[in-house]
Each structure stands twice: as C-alpha cells, then as structure tokens.
Amino acid sequence: MALLEIQNLTKRFGGLTAVNQVNLEIQTGEILGLIGPNGAGKTTIFNMVTGIYPPTGGQIYFQGQRIAHPSLTWRKRLTTPVWWLSWLPIGTIREQWDEIRTLRPHEITERGIARTFQTIRLFNNLTVLENVMAGPHHRTRSGVWGALFRPPKQREEEVFIVAEAERYLTFMGLQEYRDELAKNLPYGHQRRLEIARALATEPSLLILDEPAAGLNEQESIELMALIRQIRASGVTVLLIEHDMKVVMSICERIVVLDYGKKIAEGSPAQIQNDPRVIEAYLGESEEDEEGGGAEEPGRTGVGEEV
C-alpha cells in the first residue's frame, strides 16, 4: 500500500484549472521529486495534500485513509445525516464525517504529514528554540488552565518539548543558535530551521516546497545530505525543487507536471531524456525547430534552474 495516494486530483479556481486529473503515489521510504515549469500546479497539489485547499475533484489517501474530498455543497450537507450529527463527540460519527470532508491542516499534521513553504514562514521574533518547540505541540495535552496554574503535568510536557526541540536543532546543525531570534539567522539557516520545526511534528511524510531556493552551491550540497539523513531516519520525503542538480541527485523517482497535468514519471535518467519533459521546459515543437527553436518565455532547460 502506498503511503500517499492521489487519485484523479483536480483543482479549479473559477474558470482556471490549476490541477487536472493527476494521479500520483509515493511509497514509504522514498524521496520523490515533483517538478515542472512555473504555474504547473505543483504547490497547488501540496496545498491540497496538506488541507489548505479542498480539491474540486478526486481523492487523497494517506496510509490508506482518505484525507481530502471535494467540498460539500450546502444542499449536499443538508441531505447528509452525518453532517447534522458531526458536532457530537462520538467516535463512529466522527469517522463517518471524516470520510466525506477534507481534513483541516492541523488534523493532517496530526495524521503524520508536515511541510515547509516556498517562502520561509517562521516566528521571526521568537528564538530558534521556541520556533521548533511549536512543532510537537499536538503531541501534548496541557491547555489554557495548565499554562496558567502550571501543574506537574504541564512542567513535564514543557521539559519534553524542549528536549525534542533541542534534538532536532542538533540534527539540523542549529544547536549553537538556539537562543538567537529567528529573524537574525542567515537565510540558509532559516531554511534549516523551518525543516527542523516540521520534523518536530514527528511526520511519516515530509513535504518540502523548494527547500534549496536561495541557497548557494555549498548550502545546497549540505541540504542534500540532510535530506538523505531525514530519509534514513524513517521519514518519506516529497519535494518540489527547481534546482535540477538537487532533484537529479537525491530523488529515486520524479513526477513532471505541465499546465496542471502529469506528463511524465520515472527515474532521473528517464526524466532527463523524456521528449515530453524537454518540450515542457524548452517550449519546443517541430514547428519551433523549423523556426529556429524559439524558447517559450519563462521556461528553461531541464538541466538548469527554472
């Protein structure tokens, strides 16, 4: 059984179809790359997998359980008995309701999916340690009253969270910066910090959206080593990346999107030599070649950054 399975996934924004009938599977322990020209629908897929957008059509399954479903119209909700009872704290009712709705982002995180973003999203005025402490919050149980009165259980959980945060800071090579404000870190370290916070949620699947963006060559090499270590620790990795050196070096399998559709899937060697992929990146066709091989604006070669 695939760890993550996407079936006929579609997303429309008004009259624009951003993702069109995409099928994709990722197996446990794999590093899978999702690539394509800008606007191909890559991040939209990530946003549907993590509950930010509900799909217009299709299904998403994680560990065999459906986590995303097209939004229910109000008419459909009113005629669905379980919707009327969904507020009740009864396990069987909640399970039935979960089968016909898209889970919220925090619920998907609790299921075992964590992500980073194209644009770094940190708590800039918190320390490096405090940023990572936000990761394992869903694994604790103390609430408002615990924070106010600080019973022994609250203090135990705080010790646990700090220890977990420091473990992931050490793993990502950031321990010496634990007391620095996040906004004062160099850009490359901010990228690492965002990954450390995601890892602190203890995910089975880590989704990285352009983790090498803005990094220099040495930082990219170090990032690749870290991603391999993450996979070796038992975490499956799904990534979007425009740096083809990174993609071709660490991904066992690559899926290519163009204009919202999957056009190719295979090993790095297969993808590099696939004429459909070359055409998508170069914008070439037989007519283009006759006219001098004109390049479509905004698209570059498979071996170059996009």
Please identify what each model-predicted range represents:
Residues M1-E290, V306:
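Glycine-rich phosphate-binding loops of nucleotide-dependent enzymes
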Residues G293-E305:
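Intrinsic disorder/low-complexity segments
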